[in-house]
Structure formats: C-alpha cells, structure tokens
C-alpha cells in the first residue's frame, strides 16, 4: 500500500518545523495523517474564462473536507489569447503553457501533496495543468470554469448568434456600419466563461472528458448555469475517492497515467476529429502524451483522422450551433456514444467518473442521451442560457424545453447522418511539411478541399496583416507566414487576425494560408498550421519563394511546393551558406525578451507538441 506523499512533511520529530508551519495555515492535530489535496486554481480578473473562478476552490475544498481530506489551494497564471492577440503579447501565450505545467509541479512536489484538483478553463491553462498532472502521476480530477453563453444581437430584424470572431470580422469589414459593428462587439461575449464556440479552450475541456480525467458535462455545461456548481463539488468527492483507491486499496487505475493511456489518447483524438475541435488540440495532445510517456504521435492522429466522421459541427465552422447547443445535445458523452456505436471508441478504459471496477462503458450507459434511462441526466443536459450579461458563476437556472436527441438533423449526428464522413481535422504532409501540418477541415469550404495557388510570402504575422489589408493579397494566393514557429517566433503565435482579415475582405474562400505558427480555435477557412519542421529549424517552408506554385490536396492529405527536388536542394544549400544569418527572418524588427529566448532555446517543432527538447536536457 503506497504511503501518503504528505507524510514526508507531516510525520516524525524531524518534521516539527514543517508541522508548525502547516498549523499556521489552519491545520489542527487531527488533520495530520489526512490526505492533502492540492487545488490548482487559475482565477484572474484578466480573462473572462477565469474571472468567476475565485470561489470555486472553496467549493471543491468543502467537498474534500466532507470526505475526510485537507485541501490547500494555489493559483497559476492565465493568459487570454484573445486579448494577447494581434500584438507582441501573443508571443507569450504558448510559452505560458510550460510555465503553468512547471508551476503546478513545483507547488505539488515542494509541499508533497497527495492528489490534485485542477480548476482550469482557457487555452493554455488546461493543457499546462494536464501536462503537470501526467508528469506528477498522482490522483487528479479536472474541473473547468465552463463555456460562456453565445452572444446574440438583432441585425436587420433578425436575431443572430455571435462570438468573438464575429466581432473581429465585422470590425475589419468596411461594409459593416459603425453602429452594427458596435452592436456585435457589445454582444459577442456576454458572460463569464470560455468563448462560446468550439475554440481551443472548449475543445481542451471536452478532451479531458474523453481522456477520462474530468466529469461528464465538464466541457459543455455553461459557466453561468447553477447546475455547474455540482461539478465542482463532485470533483472534490471524486478526487478523494481516487485518493483512497490508490493510497488505501493500492489501485493504480486511479492514477492519471493509467487513465490517460494510449487508448484514451486515441479516444480523445477521435472526439477531437468528430467534433471539429481546434487545431491547437493536436499540439497539446502531443505534449500531454510525452508527459504521460505514451508513444502517441502525429502518425496516430493522421491514422485516426482518416476513419472518424464529422459528427458535431459548432462555431466557428457554423453560426447555427455553439457550446450551449452541444450541451443540449448531450455533450461529450453523447458524441462518444456515437463514436462507440460506429466502433471507433475504446470503452474498456478507466475514467474518473467511473466507480471502482467500472470503465468508460458504464459512464456512457449513464450519460449518453441515446442510452440513458435516467431523467436526472436528461434534465442535466437541458441546462441552457439565460441571455443576461454577467460575470457571475451559477447566476441562472434556465432550461431548454427539451434536450436535442435528434441524431439525424441535430447538433450531434450519428455516423449515418454525419455532417461529413471526413473528420474535422486532417494531417497533411509533403515537401513543405515532411513531418506534417494540421488543417481544421471542419472550417474548410467543400470547393477548397483541393487548392492550387501562388505563394505570397511574409516573414512575420505583422507583415502578412499589412499585406492583406493593403491589397497585396489577391484571390488565388497562398499566404505563407513563416518564422512564427515555437523557436522562430518565438512562441508560435496564433494567426487569427490574418484569417479574419481575409474573411473581411471577401477572400476567405479564395485564398489559403500556411504557417509554421498556429491558428486560434476561432479560425475557419483553408488555414494550414503547425508546418513541421518550422523555418527556424531548417524547415522547407523557409525555402518557398514569391510566386511559387503550392498544391494543397486535403483528400489526398498532401501539401506540395511545385518545384523540383534539385531546385529545393539548391535553395537549401544557399540558405546554409549564409551561416549564422541563415534560417532567420529577413529584416524583421522584433523585441524578444530573455524569458522568450530561454523558451526558444529548448523548443521543438509542432510535430513534437512544441515541448522542450529533452535531448538537450538529458546530456
């Protein structure tokens, strides 16, 4: 039977000083010997997805105390990608993932915590905490802040649903009046919570359900709904149950590395592709797999992407559905249920929502709308929006008149009635990206699944934005933005502004964009990111010249620079001959802080999840 980790600092005469300090935090004599559960919160007033999390730790703590544990809460940083976007702040977004992972590890290991509850929500916070949890391998439950309600406004006598991307596109579109642009801006983000579409934050919170590390509804229940309160309480109860299973019953299935196994990563990827999740999820799944010491690679993602259909279509891929609609249709568990019926899911895997001796199949039996006979579950998934602007969690209790269990025409479809038999994400490869790149096919117009165009090359996102807004980019161009990868940026910026501006200029379906950077979960259109290797690491994207023909074929999973191998090799030799000036952007003026330089020094390309290069650390 494993000994409590916390005993290191709470038992024996030699720990009198540590116990004295524990007492100063409020612990009493009878608290020593109880499991100490760390609560990693990410409350901040900077981020709408986190502005309501201040009191969530107390909810979790109350359930832990009731179950016989001691909780100790700490906070991590949280960067808002939407606010950091379009300026130098975006350089810090992806590197913050590593800082969050490290800070959770530091706090948990320094204080010998026995288990962990991760209160996350937005883009890099959930992945950072996930990496830490798998690195630490102690009992863990994730519970997120939940998605915000979709914005709604009245334009031309019609009520339309909105999100952050709509505000950006409208503001850049000269045909939209100042009055309408202001209406959209004020309505796009009405409540606390992660942005309302299937962007990176919501995608990752859904994936924690599929990995088996969070409770049903975690990815879809609205931040504002009173039903979400129970998720925080249940997270506290569940982490205590897992803690007892591991430390008392010696049950290693309670540990995250045994829950988030290779099969679980396959499940998460299948979910991601079925729901057309953010392309950033690929980056984070690859990074998490490395922390879990699971040999899960881009090749596995490619393999799964070729057989999983697109079962759930959500903004930004359609204006019709947002996360509130996904929840009404049964959330992640109902998408997993459809994958199971299509024989595309492993159900013999552990899950934090499963009791001892159970697995995912038992969780689906309770929570998949097609299977369940439980009226309480159907009521749970009827939780809906109130349409009242607020920054308060649990501020409303509105319900849809019925759940959406229409698997032919609803938000979630069966395989037979899928939005498309091709999934929502695809891995492409070719001489531009020999180690792969990612496209969110859910957001690509059918007419653009194959595209041939001229290269319009930019050495930075800023230059690309200027070129798009200045009229340099025309229909038929393939916009190439390079030296924006993890090492070259550094920080692998998101390219939401270039794609939004292409849309606002009417070029969204007439141009393609490829980059060694990445895209916001809010991106749609023929946007291909994560080109690997990146330009700064000797990737062929650095060898593309103005006017080169680029051929993109999504059905064939290829992306090809239409020049001969000999010409490409000659360009490579010419670049190498530049010495220290080679594989660097031309004439780019960008301040890079010491912190970012340290990140760049160890960063790998996107095909490795943009994690640290361990070969440089292991000697």
Swiss-Prot record:
Binds 1 [2Fe-2S] cluster per subunit. This cluster acts as a Lewis acid cofactor. Pathway: Amino-acid biosynthesis; L-isoleucine biosynthesis; L-isoleucine from 2-oxobutanoate: step 3/4; Amino-acid biosynthesis; L-valine biosynthesis; L-valine from pyruvate: step 3/4. It comes from Shewanella denitrificans (strain OS217 / ATCC BAA-1090 / DSM 15013). It comes from the Bacteria. This is Dihydroxy-acid dehydratase. GO terms for cellular component: cytosol. Mg(2+) binds at residues 81, 123-124, 494. It is an enzyme of class 4 (lyase).
């Amino acid at each position: 039977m494993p000994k409590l980790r916390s005993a290191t600092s709470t038992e024996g005469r030699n720990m009198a000083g540590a116990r004295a300090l524990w007492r100063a935090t409020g612990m009493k004599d009878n608290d020593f010997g109880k499991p100490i559960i760390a609560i990693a919160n990410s409350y901040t007033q900077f981020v709408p997805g986190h502005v309501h999390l201040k009191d969530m730790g107390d909810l979790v703590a109350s359930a832990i105390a009731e179950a016989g544990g001691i909780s100790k809460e700490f906070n991590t940083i949280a960067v808002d990608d939407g606010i950091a976007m379009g300026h130098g702040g975006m350089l810090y977004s992806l590197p913050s993932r590593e800082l969050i992972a490290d800070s959770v590890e530091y706090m948990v290991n320094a204080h010998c915590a026995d288990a962990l509850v991760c209160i996350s929500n937005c883009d890099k916070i959930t992945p950072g905490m996930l990496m830490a949890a798998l690195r630490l391998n102690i009992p863990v439950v994730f519970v997120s802040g939940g998605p915000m309600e979709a914005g709604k406004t009245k334009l031309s006598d019609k009520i339309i649903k909105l999100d952050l991307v709509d505000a950006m596109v409208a503001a850049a579109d000269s045909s939209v009046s100042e009055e309408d642009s202001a209406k959209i801006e004020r309505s796009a983000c009405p409540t606390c919570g992660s942005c309302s579409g299937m962007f990176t934050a919501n995608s990752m919170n859904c994936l924690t359900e599929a990995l088996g590390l969070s409770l049903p509804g975690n990815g879809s229940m609205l931040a504002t709904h009173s039903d979400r309160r129970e998720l925080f309480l249940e997270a506290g109860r569940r982490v205590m149950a897992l803690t007892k299973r591991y430390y008392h019953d010696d049950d290693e299935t309670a540990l995250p590395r045994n829950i988030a196994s290779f099969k679980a990563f396959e499940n998460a990827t299948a979910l991601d592709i079925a729901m057309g999740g953010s392309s950033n999820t690929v980056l984070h799944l690859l990074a998490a797999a490395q922390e879990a010491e699971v040999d899960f690679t881009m090749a596995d993602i490619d393999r799964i992407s070729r057989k999983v259909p697109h079962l759930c279509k959500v903004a930004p891929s359609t204006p019709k559905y947002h996360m509130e609609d996904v929840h009404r249709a049964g959330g992640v568990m109902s998408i997993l249920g459809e994958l199971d019926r299509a024989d595309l899911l492993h159900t013999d895997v552990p899950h934090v929502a499963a009791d001892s001796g159970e697995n995912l199949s038992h969780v689906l039996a309770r929570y998949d709308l097609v299977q369940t006979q439980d009226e309480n579950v159907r009521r749970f998934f009827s939780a809906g929006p109130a349409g009242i602007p607020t920054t308060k969690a649990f501020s409303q209790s509105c319900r849809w008149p019925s759940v959406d269990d229409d698997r032919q025409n609803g938000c979630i479809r069966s395989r037979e009635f899928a939005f498309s038999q091709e999934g929502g994400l695809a891995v492409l490869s070719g001489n531009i990206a020999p180690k792969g790149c990612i496209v969110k096919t859910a957001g690509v117009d059918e007419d653009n699944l194959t595209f041939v165009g001229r290269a319009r090359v930019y050495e930075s996102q800023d230059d690309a934005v200027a070129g798009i807004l200045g009229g340099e980019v025309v229909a038929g161009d393939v916009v190439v933005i390079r030296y924006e990868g993890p090492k070259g940026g550094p920080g692998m910026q998101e390219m939401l502004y270039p794609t939004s501006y292409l849309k606002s200029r009417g070029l969204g379906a007439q141009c393609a964009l490829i980059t060694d950077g990445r895209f916001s979960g809010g991106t749609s259109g023929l946007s291909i990111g994560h080109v690997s290797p990146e330009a700064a690491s000797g990737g062929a994207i650095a060898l593309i010249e103005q006017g080169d023909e680029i051929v993109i074929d999504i059905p064939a999973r290829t992306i090809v620079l239409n020049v001969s191998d000999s010409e490409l090799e000659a360009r490579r030799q010419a670049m190498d001959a530049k010495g220290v000036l080679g594989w660097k952007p031309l004439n780019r003026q960008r301040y890079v802080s010491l912190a970012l330089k340290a990140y760049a020094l160890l960063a790998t390309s996107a095909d490795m999840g943009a994690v640290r290069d361990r070969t440089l650390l292991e000697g």
